[in-house]
Amino acid sequence: MFYRMIENKRNQWLSSPDCTITSLIDYIVKTGQMRDAQIEAIKTYLFLKIACEGKPLATLFKHGAFNTLDLNALELSQSTRDYLISHPSAAALFEYVCMKNDNDEQVSAKLEKAIKKTPDSIDYNKVWNDTFYGVSYTDYLFSLPMGAGKTYLMAAFIYLDLYFAMNEPHNSAFAHNFIIFAPSGLKSSVVPSLKTIQNFNPSWIIPEPAATDIKRMISFEVLDQSKTEKKSNKTKNPNVQKIANHQPLSELFGLVAVTNAEKVILDRIQEKDGQISMFEESDDEKDRQANELRNLIGKLPSLSIFIDEVHHAVSDEIKLRAVVSRWAENQTVNSVIGFSGTPYLEKAEKIKITDDLAVGTAEITNIVYYYPLIDGVGNFLKRPIVKIAEVADSSRIIENGVRLFFDTYKDTVYDGGLVAKLGIYCGTIEKLEEVVYPIVSSIAAEYGISSDAILKFHKGNKQYPQPADGQMQFDILDKSISKIRVVLLVQIGKEGWDCKSLTGIILSQEGDCPKNMVLQTSCRCLRQVVKGTPETALIYLNDTNADKLNAQLMQQHHIWYCQVFFANSFLIK
């Protein structure tokens, strides 16, 4: 709910004479290339950078930067009113605990009463430091659902920072260099992230000639190569070489490095019981090289660190914060900008206010912007039709789902010649080869579709080797040359799979995907193909996966599919 205070103050600023970005926002809207979710995020980003000078959230809340309550209009004792007026950090906490959520539930009536009674009994500075994890650096999190265009939004932030930094090179609010941590759990996410950012057209958000000038300045680096050759302990870390090539680092401007935090930045770091060891005194060559890279990145001036899919890095969060805190000691870190699909924690946390009082929050506290998943449906996401099979037999569910898909989407061809595709998750390679493929190929033949239009995509085992051209066919699914209509998968494509022409998903049994990934897997088919065009997609589930989908929607987005998210859901016998 802290983001609501930020949004309220942002809106006040945008409509005030102090706002300096009105013409820029008008330009972005006029170009028509950015989604509403992205434009609203840009407004918040620039508000925090310009009006709030890019300061850490704890500092801003202590200074009352987001206070909007008219204390003179509230029923307060004169002493309490005077205290809150003269102590903006207290007024900020008071405003927060008085807020109500979408269910009209107040954050904390108890705390409101306590502040009214004895406002000087709370250490407000400590509360705000604890609320935002005690970090000394700027750490903002943007929560947007899948399909909102988070990677393009990163690119927009990069270009906007450089645009303002060129005009005000000594303004510390704007970053000069950037490192992007691609999702830690996705091994193949680094290069696609880089390509998406490289393909971004800065003239969508910045007028010419500045857009082209900045694009020419940017240099890209992928930090993903192996550390050393096996037979050498003297070979230099190639990632270090890539950064060192940009010497002198003190004058560096416009570097965009993309890497996998887990495999590169957090390499050779151990965490035990909250204690971090970076083996800085180690004689081990791999330890030395890992630290060499970290130390060099820590010298990049005015560095903004972008973390994609923050929820992936939960197990590595302590390590990552330790590394960033070490970099921040050099006074080189401009900010940490995170991106996540959900604002909600797995379980609520307590923020201690006094020995007797605490306030619970189910949201990640450093979220500065939140775009609900439900607002994306029918906007930049296809409108899903969810079918829940009453029968338990996996083969029958697949058979019925494939027939329904072909009945509905057999002749669907999107702009650009992309044919609609169905994804079926199979659990095991044996099931894919021995059960699912025969069923699908038989039904496809009935509809006049060749078996060549069925892609078997898995990594292979002793009995069934990896299909020879499987990876190539998978990589071109979203191109007009692909004639694939059905993709059979085993433990691949659960997340980070960006295929807009995917128009249906079948999960026929428990184990087709990890239990905690049913929502992400089901929603793979919801990315919109043509902007502004009403599109639908089929999600066909057995009852177990439907229950998990519902539970994960409730946990991660606080919505229930039969009531709100999926208007077209049916029980199929």
Name each model feature, range by range.
Residues L153, N171-D213, E262-K263, G427-E433:
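Conserved Walker A/P-loop ATP-binding site and its immediately adjacent core
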Residues W13-S143:
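Conserved pre-motif I regulatory segment
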Residues K150-F164:
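Motif I (Walker A/P-loop) of helicase-class P-loop NTPases
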Residues A58-L60, A148, P209-I243, S250-V258, ...:
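Conserved C-terminal RecA-like helicase domain
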Residues P169, R321-V323, W327-I443:
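Interdomain helical connector at the RecA1-RecA2 junction of SF1/SF2 helicase-like NTPases
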Residues I180, A257-N260, F306, N334-G341, ...:
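Structural recognition of the conserved hydrophobic beta-strand(s) that form the central parallel beta-sheet
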Residues G460-C562:
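Conserved RecA-like P-loop NTPase helicase motor core
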Residues K263-V264, D273-Q331:
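SF2 helicase catalytic motif II
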